[in-house]
Design a protein with these regions (language model features):
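Metallo-beta-lactamase
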Residues: 105, 112-114, 177, 186-188, ...
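Active-site HxH/HxHxD metal-binding segment of metal-dependent hydrolases
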Residues: 32-42, 48-49, 115-186, 279, ...
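Zn-dependent metallo-beta-lactamase
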Residues: 28-104, 114, 316, 321
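Conserved beta-strand hairpin/beta-sheet module of binuclear metal-dependent hydrolase folds
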Residues: 72-128, 208-230
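Divalent metal-coordination and catalytic microenvironments
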Residues: 85, 99, 109, 142, ...
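Bacterial N-terminal signal peptides
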Residues: 11-22
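Sec/Tat signal peptide C-region and signal peptidase I cleavage site
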Residues: 23-27
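Bacterial N-terminal signal peptides that target proteins for export
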Residues: 2-12
Length: 321
């Protein structure tokens, strides 16, 4: 997947910045006694943790106005099988996934509205040989409309929908206790267990889900992230930093080595390209498998970028005084 021009320029600019040698703060001081940029050492540190797959995340999260690749203008994507038991039935800019278990199907996210649920998700499932009537649970990773908008279509069919308590608020409130996701909660269908994590910051109740996937019979552990980008200022960034620490610890213990990106190339451009272009996939190569160590390094990079942004916000506020 090619980076768009805005992303490419951002990556080039940040590459120049972070490859500058670290010099004493007094030497970095500009003309007129301007204070040095205290965020630069953190940005440089984050850059050392990244690699080509995560440059898009680095460019997005290591500056205040990083490129936004999720533009809400996507079309229906080609439905495809990602693993033996995981399928994609979303759009080109935002995802919907189906996990197949021996106890039925689990749908993650529902696109923008009931019309997209009916015209994209359901036909996509049928094209892949999945029966929509076998859906046992619908999970909304968070309350933003591009993930939850199709929920009424599935609730009208009497399906169980699960959302975190905090994110049920914008959706009209939880209908019952069984509809609320709790941190560390495990839901099991057949032989498949799904572990939920609360990772607030993108919304007050964003969740992530961990579950086993199989690639030609080989077991892996996948993480489906609802959203990690903060939607607010310093306080929300600090919340995200805590959420990343929680995510890192839980995924390390679980051995997560597969990461599912919620949007177009927000986390990993190679992974999204793999999802979008099934006809270009190479035999015996699944680009969604990143490895446990690589993912842990990514969480460290992301946390460091968020710390840098906190410093940027503080410097911006100080400069305005």
């Amino acid at each position: 997947m090619q980076l768009n021009n805005k992303v490419a320029r951002a990556v080039l600019l940040l590459g120049i910045i972070v490859t500058l040698p670290c010099v004493p703060a007094t030497a970095q001081q500009g003309r007129g006694g301007r204070a040095p940029d205290q965020s630069l050492p953190l940005v440089q540190q984050a850059f050392k943790m990244t690699d080509a797959r995560y440059l898009i995340s680095f460019s997005r999260y290591c500056m205040l106005d990083g490129p936004n690749t999720a533009n809400g203008k996507g079309d229906a994507a080609t439905p495809s099988q990602l693993f033996d038991n995981l399928y994609y039935v979303g759009k080109t800019d935002v995802g919907a996934w189906v996990l197949r278990t021996s106890g039925g199907l689990v749908l993650f996210d529902t696109l923008n509205n009931p019309q997209e649920a009916a015209s994209i998700v359901v036909p996509g499932m049928r094209k892949l040989g999945l029966d929509p009537d076998q859906i046992k649970l619908v999970v909304l990773t968070h309350s933003h409309n591009d993930h939850s908008g199709g929920m009424p279509y599935f609730r009208a069919k009497g399906l169980r929908v699960m959302v975190s308590e905090a994110d049920w608020g914008p959706l009209g409130g939880a209908p019952n206790a069984d509809s609320v996701v709790h941190d560390g909660q495990i839901v099991t269908f057949g032989e498949t267990s799904i572990t939920f994590l609360l990772i607030p910051g993108h919304t007050p109740g964003t969740i992530a889900a961990m579950f086993p996937v199989f690639d030609r019979g080989q077991r892996h552990v996948a993480l489906l992230v609802g959203g990690i980008g903060p939607t607010g200022g310093v306080d929300m960034h600090r919340t995200v930093i805590n959420s990343i620490a929680h995510l890192s610890a839980a995924t390390k213990q679980a051995g997560v080595d597969v990461v599912i990106d919620p949007h177009e190339a927000i986390i990993d451009s190679a992974a999204w390209g793999y999802i979008m272009h099934p006809q270009e996939r190479k035999t015996n190569q699944n680009d969604l498998i990143v490895g446990a160590e690589r993912f842990q390094r990514f969480t460290q990079m992301l946390s460091t970028c968020m710390q840098a942004r906190v410093v940027m916000y503080q410097q911006k506020a100080d400069a305005a005084r």
